[in-house]
Every structure is written in structure tokens, then in C-alpha cells.
Amino acid sequence: MKTQIEIAREGTISSQMMAVAAEEHVSPDYVRQMVAEGKIVIPGNHSRKPRAVGIGKGLRTKVNASIGTSSDIIDYGAEVRKALAAQEAGADTLMELSVGGDLDRVRREVIAAVDLPVGNVPLYQAFCEAARKYGDPNKLDPEMLFDLIEKQCEDGMAFMAVHCGINLYTIERLKRQGYRYGGLVSKGGVSMVAWMMANRRENPLYEQFDRVTSILRKYDTVLSLGNGLRAGAIHDSSDRAQIQELLINCELAELGREMGCQMLVEGPGHVPLDEVEGNIQLQKRMSGGAPYYMLGPISTDVAPGFDHITAAIGAAQSSRYGADLICYITPAEHLALPNEEDVRQGVKAAKIAAYIGDMNKYPERGRERDKEMSKARRDLDWKKQFELALFPEDAKAIRASRTPEDEATCTMCGDFCASRGAGKLFAADLRGDKI
């Protein structure tokens, strides 16, 4: 069976492209053309047809939610509930990143529970199984890794983060660079670096990239090029090791497209605001416009407990400058495994950030809703305000918890409501839509 990019290059508009066009209010041929050029991807799988979600140029910024067990907390039911919570809160995609317990079981239960495109990181299970089998993750046999990639694709993975961009030269550059404030923060990245150093061998995912691509192409699983050397501190942002890996990933993105595979490129997780635009411009230029998947990014390192906010600030900037998919960050980041409420708060913060970014990325089509909300507030039209709200149930709950004496107003101002006062003074003028 053919991949979406191969279908698009033949001039055919698939049912998935049609669905994306309808959802995004763009023409089907636009979607087809961008898919053909590798500037839009539609995560999916021949063995499982998830909801059609387009990621890339000219489309709204999408939000990914990541869940998964840890070695300390293994609760399969909780992960399914978190997956459902993410879907209900508005996540566009989901990543199942378990490293504890029966990894086949949790992956399959999560995939069965949601209709979102689900992705994962195959290195996690590979190193977990090597540790269980041999007592040492560095004894991982590359054949086991490729077998796992195939098995996970068979299970229905719609996209897969694969750490292909770490090679021996990248590690040498990291060593020459020396000190890093945040060290290495990618579980998959540090595990692969450790394996390469222990075995004095090249990264098999880089060395046999054509094999990786061949497996994912077989299932039309999107290949998301992971960033194992991403900065884990804003003072490490855009350092030589990170940029070296990005350069390799951008080269691999071009190669993967030539092989008929849909390609994503992953971006960093900690970026000061003044570096966001340049980082995205660099990726877009070097990758030929491949969709960019930013992890956050967190914009300051000193707000644990509130990193859903620090990441939302960075994500809004990223969306504004061209990021196509952003990974949510929860309040539990750097502190604990997220629970259901953390997942909800993370998704909502990221959705708001994506919306704000899109308002500025697409001003001609992104601000009408805000104008209508302003008019509804001016007119004290509460029904309309809730209809326009990104999260109406949250807004309704807050208002209901503090009921005003006059239902036309709220308890913030009560008798001193500015909107009501201005309406009485300038009723005709303030309600003229031309103002």
C-alpha cells in the first residue's frame, strides 16, 4: 500500500486529505500539494485509521499530549484515563511513552481507547527489554530494536519518534563542546549515547536509516526525527550539539521524503524567547519546510509547578513563527509523573498557546472569534461569551461558583460594571459594529 506522500505525488487526493481540508477550511488540492512536498503530514497507519489530523504549512497549530507509565508508577487504567482526558481536553495527537510494566499491554490499551493518532518512542521499550533480558541496556541487540519498531507499527502507531540524528560525530562534537548546564535530558537520547559509547559503535538508527524508513513506509507511519541532544536548560539552547543533531535530522528528513515516508522534525524543549524565531527559521530552511514539532518549549527554568505556563509562553511564540505541532507540558514537569488533572491543564494551556500563535500567524482568519467575544462582553451577552470560549465549561463553572446579585453582571465589579455603565451612556454608538 502507498503512503500519503506517494499518493499525493501521483496527483490523487486521498480521503484523509479531504478530511483535513474540510477541518482546516482549505482546498483539498492545497493539502495534496503540501503533502506531496513534505510540508504537511497526516499521521496514520494502514492497520489502524485514526482521526485525520493534518500537521504543517497553512494549517492550525496542533497540540500533542504525552502520557505513559514510569518505573515507579505502573497503573494501566490510569494511563487510559489520562489518554481519554487528553482527548476530551482537545489534544490533536497523543504519545504513549511508557517505560514501566507491560509495555505492549499499555500501548495497545491506549490505542484502543482513543481515536487520536498515537505515537511513541521505540527506544524506550528496546532498552527496557534489554535491561530485563541481559541486566544491562547497553547489551541491546540492534535486531531487537528493529523488530520492536515493526511490532509497534503493526499495533497501529501513527507516528514514531526515532533518534536517528545522534551519530559518532555528534557525540564527538558534544565532547569537544564540554560543559552543559542541563546535561542530557532526553531518555532516548542519553540511552543511545550510552549504548554507542559502551559498544564503540555507530547508532544503528542512523547507520541503517533506510531500514527504519522502509519499516515506517510499509505502514505509512510518520517518522518523527527525535532530538536526543535537545537543550534541557535555556542556557544550553542552540548550542553546537543541538544544532549538529538538527542539521543531521534535516538531511534525513529530505532523504526520508525521497524514500516515500512522511517526515516530521522535532525541536528543542528549553528556549529563551529571543531564540525561538531563529530556531524555527533555521529548521525550516535546512529541512525544506518539513513540519516542526516543538517540545514546549519552556521559556524559563525557575518555575517548577507552573511549567505548563512557561511552556505556553514559549509555545505561543513558536506557533507564531511557524511551529506546526507543540507538545504540551504539564504542571508536574520536572517534579512527578502527571496525573489526569495535570494532563487536562497541560492540554488546555497548550491549546490556548496554539490559538494565540495562530491568531498572529494567520491574522486574516484568526481574529474574528476574538472580535465577536469582545462584542459579547460589551453587550453582557453571557450565553454568547460561553459559546465563543475555548473552554466554555470551565468558564461556566467559575461564574456559577460566585453568582452575582444582578445576573447581567459578574461579582468582579457588581454595581460598578463598566460595560453596563458605558452601555447606558452610549447605547447606540457603542453597539455600532463600525466602531
Swiss-Prot record:
Cofactor note: Binds 1 [4Fe-4S] cluster per subunit. The cluster is coordinated with 3 cysteines and an exchangeable S-adenosyl-L-methionine.
Domain of life: Bacteria
GO BP terms, alphabetized: cobalamin biosynthetic process; thiamine biosynthetic process
Residues annotated to bind Zn(2+): H270, H334
Binding site for substrate: M95, Y124, H163, S186, K187, G188, N227, G228, L229, R230, E266, Y293
InterPro entries linked to this entry: ThiC/Bza_core_dom, ThiC/BzaA/B
Cofactor(s) needed by this chain: [4Fe-4S] cluster
E.C. number: 4.1.99.23
Catalytic activity: 5-amino-1-(5-phospho-beta-D-ribosyl)imidazole + AH2 + S-adenosyl-L-methionine = 5-hydroxybenzimidazole + 5'-deoxyadenosine + formate + L-methionine + A + NH4(+) + phosphate + 2 H(+)
Protein residues bound to [4Fe-4S] cluster: C410, C413, C417
Record key words, sorted: 4Fe-4S, Cobalamin biosynthesis, Iron, Iron-sulfur, Lyase, Metal-binding, S-adenosyl-L-methionine, Zinc
Gene Ontology CC: cytosol
Pfam families: ThiC_Rad_SAM
MF-aspect GO terms: 4 iron, 4 sulfur cluster binding; lyase activity; metal ion binding
Its biological purpose: Catalyzes the conversion of aminoimidazole ribotide (AIR) to 5-hydroxybenzimidazole (5-HBI) in a radical S-adenosyl-L-methionine (SAM)-dependent reaction. Is thus involved in the anaerobic biosynthesis of the benzimidazole lower axial ligand of the cobamide produced by G.metallireducens.
Family to which the UniProt record says this protein belongs: Belongs to the ThiC family. 5-hydroxybenzimidazole synthase subfamily.
Complex formation: Homodimer.
Protein name per its UniProtKB record: 5-hydroxybenzimidazole synthase
